[in-house]
Amino acid sequence: MRRVLLATLMAALPAAAMAADAEHVVEARKGYFSLVALEFGPLAAMAKGEMPYDAAAAKAHASDLVTLTKYDPSDLYAPGTSADDVKGTAAKAAIWQDADGFQAKGMAFFEAVAALEPAAGAGQKELAAAVGKVGGTCKSCHDDFRVKR
């Protein structure tokens, strides 16, 4: 009986480790996007007139976003980390089923953020236009690859 129990436990260890790894990947992914939101939020608020436009602050937030886009997020999208696999994530399995489409959405985001940086310090009107483009890339990706909550 002990051997059966031991064999069962030994067989379960890799599955438990994989589950823990998947949960860590999801937490890291959430952390990355929390940083994106932290930097993008004030830019969106300035663009909408919800807070006063501040060229220096806008440039700093935009620069930080550019820095975040230089991070290779591939480790944040390990197979087995969709909403079908792990609780607490909104990532659709479509991310892995349509990897090319997902990457194209990511590249559109990176390009929009690159265009945001020079616009951020140019004035509220210029910032608003660039923020709209970045926000559009976010929405486009969420529409296709994020579970609606």
UniProtKB/Swiss-Prot annotation:
InterPro entries: Cyt_c/b562 (IPR010980), Cyt_c_II (IPR002321), Cyt_c_prime (IPR012127), Cyt_c_prime_subgr (IPR015984). Keywords: Electron transport, Heme, Iron, Metal-binding, Signal, Transport. Residues 1-19 form the signal peptide. Binds 1 heme c group covalently per subunit. It comes from the Bacteria. Heme c binds at residues 29, 89-90, 138, 141-142. One of its GO terms (cellular component) is periplasmic space. GO terms for molecular function: electron transfer activity; heme binding; iron ion binding. Coiled coil: none annotated. Gene3D superfamilies: Cytochrome c/b562. One of its GO terms (biological process) is electron transport chain. Monomer and homodimer. Cytochrome c' is the most widely occurring bacterial c-type cytochrome. Cytochromes c' are high-spin proteins and the heme has no sixth ligand. Their exact function is not known. This is Cytochrome c'. It comes from Cereibacter sphaeroides (strain ATCC 17023 / DSM 158 / JCM 6121 / CCUG 31486 / LMG 2827 / NBRC 12203 / NCIMB 8253 / ATH 2.4.1.).
